[in-house]
Amino acid sequence: MSQQDSQRWLPTDRLIYGVLVKSFLPLQRYPELVYENSNYANVYVGAEVYVFEESVDKKWCRAYQCLRPFPEEFISNMNSANDVLPDVKPKVVIFPRKYVHFEAEKAVSTMPFFKAPSAEDFKPLISKECESRSFCDSLYVSSTDDISTGKPRKTPRPPFPFFRYQKRSFKDEMGPILSLISSHVYSMYSIGEFSIYRKMIKLYYDLDTIRFRLSMNLTTEAEKINLIRAATSLRTKIAKFLSSTYRKNKLIANSTPRNPDPYGFEGIFARDIDTGELLSYEIDKLRTLVSSSMLCGLTNNFPTVPVVESDDESSSNGLFGTVRSSILVNLKDLAWDPSISDPKYQDLSICVYLRTKDEVLTESFTMTKSSNMESALDEIPAMLFKNILETIVHKNKVYLVVVLKETIAITTETAPEISSYNISTEESSSHSPFSPFNSSTENKIDHVKKGLAAGVINISPVFKFYNGLSVANKAQRFNLYLYSSDSSDSQNFNSSKDADLGWGGLINKIIKDSSEGVSVNPRAVSLSVTVKEIIGKQEAEKVLSTSLVPIRSIPTYFYDTMFSQAERIYLNLGRVSLYGLPAADTNIENVTVQISCRNKAVKFCKNKLEERSGDWKFVSVRPNESIGESIRIEGVENMNEDETLRVLVYLNGFLMAKSNIHIKKKNEIIEYRKGTVFQIMSSKSVPLIHLELEASYFGRRYNINPAITNFLVLQTKNVEFDQQLKEHYSVTLKQLNNVSFKDLLKHFDTILAHYLLLLESVNEATDKKGPSSSLPNIVFSEFVKFLNLMLTHQENSRYWFNRLYKKVMSKELECPNVAPILIKHMTTIFDRSHSSWTRTGTAICRTILYIIVLAIGSSHSDEMPNFSHFFRSLHKFLMLADEPIMADQILLIESIPSMLETMTNHCKVEDLVRFAIGLFECCQEKEMNQKMYSRPLSVREEEYLNTKFNCLLKLINKKVLQNYLTNTESVDKLRLQFLSKTLEWLLTPYTPGDDKCFHVESLRLVNSVFITIIEDYKFDMLQRNLIRLLPYLCKSFVHLRRYCKKARLMRPRRVFTMLFPREIPCNYIPVDSIVNDEVVVEVLLELAIIICEITKIASSRFPSYQSFSEIINLCDKDTLFQSNFYSRQITNENVYTITKTVFLFFKQDWFPGMKWLGVSALLGRSSLILLSLCKDYIIENNSPSPSKESEKRVDMRLWAEYVKVILLVSNHKSASLTKLAITPRKAVYLISGDLKKISAYILNECWDALATGHYNITYAKKYGLGALSDCQFELFVHNQFLIREIFIFAFHRHIDATRICCKILWGLGLNFWRIFGSLQPAVNACIPELFSAYQIGKLRLNDYELERFVSCLFFMMHVPDSDTFFPACMDFLRDLLGFLHIVNEIYKIPNQEEFDDDRTARHIEMFEYLLEANRPELFHKMIYDLFIHFIQKKDFVQAALSLELLAGTYAWDSNDTLEAISFPPLPEQSSFERKEYLLKESARNFSRGQKPEKALAVYKDLIKAYDEINYDLNGLAFVHDQIAGIYTRLQSIDRLVPTYFKVSFMGFGFPKSLRNKSFVFEGLPFEHITSMHDRLLRSYHGSNIVHSQEEVDMLLMNPPMGKYIHVASVEPCLSISDNYNSSDKKSSINNKVRMYIENRDLRTFSNSRRLPGAKGVTDLWVEEYTYHTMNTFPTLMNRSEIVKVTKSKLSPLENAIRSLQVKIQELYGLENMCNKTLKDHGDVNDLFTELSTNITGTISAPVNGGISQYKAFLEPSTSKQFSTDDLGRLTLAFDELVAVLGRCLTLHAELLPSKDLKPSHDLLVRLFEENFAEEIERYSRTLSEANRSRNNMITARIISHKNPNKKASFSGRDHHTSGSNHSQFVLEHSDSFGPNSLLFGKYLTRTLSHSSTTSSLDKSGIVSGTSSTFLAGSQPNTNTDSQHKHDYSHSG
């Protein structure tokens, strides 16, 4: 491709998605390309690109690359969970077209609002009269540079596809999700959250497995749904894990404000549970959207585990009882002790059944298998235990029992005998009790059943009742531990009290958790059991019919109406014992009981599925043990009139006793209670065995209760009732109701049918004789009581009733026509309820539903009863207000929905609707009379309200009524009347009030009814009137939230309930353990959803009606909807209420709005619809007009509230689409849509409306905007927070939002110019609000957004170049954009402690703008925080620099008055006084921090102020005194010299404030470079140290990822006068002077590098680099950026001099440190090592000769080459070196830690004298001459007569004596508390009361004493008028 073609690019018609299939790495071969064009980059295989341009020859592409973060970025930038996670970044790259594979089928969604701004976008906003160019055009024309904001030269490139996954499917979303997880894995590892890190890794692999299976279509449809649900659940866990890592770090004051989770990674979003697609606003129900969000956010494993049952999973028929459960059981993995290799089971039988603690629930399933248990367990079929009653599950724990028995062979060689049988003299051995029978066939048995082990497990957790839907339809695995019976004590046990002894009592002991008599059999230790609940009869039958493995159905043990009940008897054997013999005295090992019957039709079995047997051998036990085995006896109907069971008892296999037991006698089955004892006789017909047994009969043929028999024989046809017969009937009926439920249940159908016949017969007889008889009432009363007894709380009888009802309805059974009779009796009782109410009435309320069913079923089509009178009687009853009757009213209301449903086939639906209206109207009237909605309620009243609204909910959900009510084909007035009345009933509980007591549970049912009406009833009239309810609902929301807060409902909880419950009380759902401290107020969420649904109706069904006023006018003729709840007109109060509601929506203290972003987006969209409905009203009724009087009527507070909530919604986190990650962005947009477009439209309309009637044509022509008014100005100036919100809104990446905000900002600026003639007030208003936006973390900028905003602002601004307004605009823009630039830069600084200094520096720049904007308090607060921080660290120099910086903000103005401030605490005073005070404190802290040079500089500034501004002589005296003290102290101060380092930062791991920049750092005294390395590595985590300058140059050329630091030592550059000669001065003074000069103006440093080619020091040339810093040291943060670098060459001699000076300075520092350590009595061991090493290296260096090598320059052969002056300087340097070396050697001798080192010291002295002999001699000679000269000068001064008073003056000032008035400083009492007095009183008093010698100075500052605590302590008094009075009087 030619160069010309390469520069020509053609845009594609759309963004094209592609993936690189080959890496393109241009920078590997040509790294310099990166400097030619930033689009050149290395692009690797797999890169995701979006092409937007192609070259002309189609060979090259330019595209966006989704640049994923590298691991180094996480390590470099992540320090805590608060830090912003590195995300995908768009980068424009160039690559060959052939390297990419395009996937054109993947559509890329581009949003028009992301477009780049252009002039065309702003033309509609500019006045047509405008004659000037835009700012953008002006800059473009006036500049020859290519300005980014100028006119585009080609078609702008499309925006980056932020919504690239908007139209992708669920499985396509898995890719970015996995990429996101990998980012989180890196981030969690980087911040040390290793537990979350490991969980994230597991999530990654789980999701990747699901992605693979879905992508490859490796699933069935059912599996696909399960995988999608699992993936949805895992995605939600990601958000929860991330949320759990969030910690509220206590950041220091100058840290960058952080908006937690800016990307929405913690966001919870609702998905379709079957497809996995995100739910949307347009398609899905809002109730589903919010409920799914709540379940995802609060529960574990949703939607994998269902939490709420669907509508069709509820009770299938509430009329006939709840759905029963069945339990599916499967046995696996019988385990034995590892010590046993083979348990050797013998004909093992396994018995399984269910029971509670007290009763057996099912028959047992028994199966006998071979000894090979590996195959035996596989052969055992699964067991289905059917029809477990719900009442049993609710009241008891359900246990699964497994019993293992084996059949073993026994030997019959050992006959039973007694070990020690006492025989009297009269008796013989023939009297032994053990005498076998002579029968040859039955006298012995060779096999017995022995109990091996048994186990019990509580399986209650598998029932949905206990754990909800999380366990429904899911099998649970249990490990069932097996135990055996320990019968060692049974031999000595003879008491009959313990029935649980031995094998038969083992199960009870295990249940009771008793260890007595329980052991472990190593042959059977445990068993694995799988248990699953099957709900409903149909599901159970489905399992049986579709299972691929055999399943046995096990019936119940009790009399169950759902099974075909065969006649049967259950026989259970208890304890068996020897009669009169202790078991321990016998050799009996086993007792076996066998039963049989001579009647061959009588059979025995364990359950009805087993093969029947003519006899049954029970398990063998030892004497005194319980057998505990139950069997079933069948063939009861074939028994003789008298029937017995034959009982045989074998002892050790020998038949020793037998007897017959009656089981039937005189045609009655004999039942034996538990514990009944029978004596079994021996062959000698004497009792030998005591046997306990229990026999229970289950059947209805025998043992019928006499009362039932008497009732069934009552005549029902052609009966003539006399008084005696009436009494007989009455007594019989009452006796019947006294029969036990168990007996009544067996004959329930017969009794019920006979009762109906009896009702008909008695009624007919009464009709013939007249109404005087009371028998019909008695019969009806007893009938109702019978129904109440049998049907109210009993499931079995309801099933019988159901069967009877079905037979009647199918005409299989003829039923007497008792309908009129039943209705008449009930009507009569309800009519009389106001005067008398009996138990019969209560029974009717309990059973009215069943009575109505009987009435409907028994009525003939031509004789349908008239229900109207009956309905009216019910209405009367419900009007009663008596508290006792309310319980019966509740029962009646509960039955209404099912009752009406039953009547739908026999009554007109319209009649039922009228009845319902009347019923609820009666309830409503009673509630209003009793003021139920405005006072606390009793428990009964609450139950009543809940029942009423639950009834209403069920009613509108009943299919027949719903079909009628939802029919929209015709307009039916009754239908609309019912709906309008329903809305009134629902809205009444919401009636607002200040002290309103809301009944939350009732309101939740109200909400359920309300949402059902909104969702299912689509009448236009209804829906448009629902919109009129919005103001009322908003008001209700405000009051309800206030009540919830007052009632403490807005607190974190560990449980929650489903939204819109179907019944109260609700089922509580536990919160996931990952989730902490979430507040969810369900009732508020429900009401918010209702409001959202209605706003959705307004926007979708009535889009052409854009205001409340239009909707209200549309509903004028809707007479049914004109109650007080509906708005008839909109008022200011309505608008205030709506804005308050929107504000509370986003206050979000009632649900986790920052996490449930989908719900927040929904509330945002609904809020904007609400506000848009109010817009027309506000504009029409609250806009200004040309007259000033009308402007006064404008409610600016209303405008402020309205605009505030618009911006609140628009600036919410859920509205920041580009800030969100890819999936949250997609989810939010599906719900919220383009919110900002609506917001921008409303804001534009409002802004223009505020200028209604005000149009400035001049401004329109010159500046492009003419609609300007004082109202606009007042709105934003009096509510300046709106300016902040406008700026935040402007920086959203949305063209409409930005351009409208720019219009408003430009208009606001024009208003400022129009009113003030200056833009400085605009700066004062904008800058603080921008800072406020930054502080709260909402003003988050990047380079592109700032550039975009500037472009839009320049397109909007129109100012003629020659206009006086132009310079003001430029100044305004300079301040505004400068501040925004700082905000932009500060967000590039990572939020880690290591970058605090960079952040502080940026904050200081930021506060300079705030100072200019007349907002110094923020700056003051920051400086004060810094000061306190440094004082606490005892870093007095940094504290002083902070105060100096603060003092610089004040002018030397003594005529103004400043208000008192809190930070720092300063009184009311002038600017001069405040600045003076701060400078003095700064100087004091400089002195305390050993920086007297800085203190001198401060005092010199004060001298200038005192001398030139206010002529304060006292101040001058004080300052000069301080300066004199400092100069004096400088001559004797011992202080340590810090080390300085040049530090360079390279790599993209550093922010721009550090990257590729160099600084000079002030280190610690004598700090080694390795120590600086360690400190920097600790501060800048993850950094690498670079050691060579060559590496630094390479890194600067090609910056890599990561962090790289280079450190080099630098030395301060001294600037000493050439006239300064140290030879005549003491070396100690010379050292102090040198330190003074060095620290006086320290901002220049140097280091050097050797040049190659030198052979020795005399020809060694070096390059010296001099670094100039921005600030003078000491400086804030102990560092300053290098702003200038100069390079120069040093000759060999200059290098020698420089090296000597450096060494001298180093030795001076060591000397000072030693002196200071000795003075402070510190540890000298480490110091001695450092001193010894340095002296040794100086005197006699082992390598290169050390310092002595520089003497070569003084040799005659070499000295000729250099000038005499330079050689003189070298000589002086050697002299000074000798002096300091001598002192150091003296210190070395003093510091010797032991005498053993004295020889080493002597050697050093000797070497010193040898190597520096010439210098020592010269220095000694010079020193002697200097001493003689000085002595002569002092003598001359003493005897001089020129100044006789000098000595007196000296003594008079500095030698003050007690009692004299010389130089006395007088302080008045009133002057001692001013700010200046504080300083003078502290400093001058001490100065004048002590001598001026250095003894008055301590080590920490100018004077001794405690430091001032003015900043951290109390505030001084503010008496500024006091003057210090000095009286310097001297005596003669």
UniProtKB/Swiss-Prot annotation:
Disruption phenotype: Leads to hyper-resistance to cell wall stress agents such as calcofluor white and Congo red. Keywords: Cytoplasm, Mitochondrion. Residues 1908-1932 are annotated as: Disordered. Residues 1922-1932 have a biased composition (Basic and acidic residues). It comes from the Eukaryota. Residues 1410-1824 form the DOCKER domain. Residues 1908-1921 have a biased composition (Polar residues). GO terms for molecular function: guanyl-nucleotide exchange factor activity; small GTPase binding. The keyword Mitochondrion applies. It is found in: Cytoplasm; Mitochondrion. InterPro entries: DOCK, DOCK_C_lobe_A, DOCK_C_lobe_C, DOCKER_dom, DOCKER_Lobe_C. One of its GO terms (biological process) is autophagy of mitochondrion. It holds the Pfam family DHR-2_Lobe_C. GO terms for cellular component: cytoplasm; mitochondrion; plasma membrane. Coiled coil: none annotated. Forms a transiant heterodimeric complex with LMO1, that acts as a guanine nucleotide exchange factor exchange factor (GEF) for the small GTPase RHO5. DCK1, LMO1 and RHO5 relocate to mitochondria upon oxidative stress and trigger cell death. The DCK1/LMO1/RHO5 signaling module mediates mitochondrial turnover under nitrogen starvation conditions via mitophagy. The DCK1/LMO1/RHO5 signaling module plays also a function in cell wall integrity signaling. Present with 238 molecules/cell in log phase SD medium. Forms an active heterodimer with LMO1. Belongs to the DOCK family. This is DOCK-like protein 1. The lineage of its organism: Eukaryota, Fungi, Dikarya, Ascomycota, Saccharomycotina.
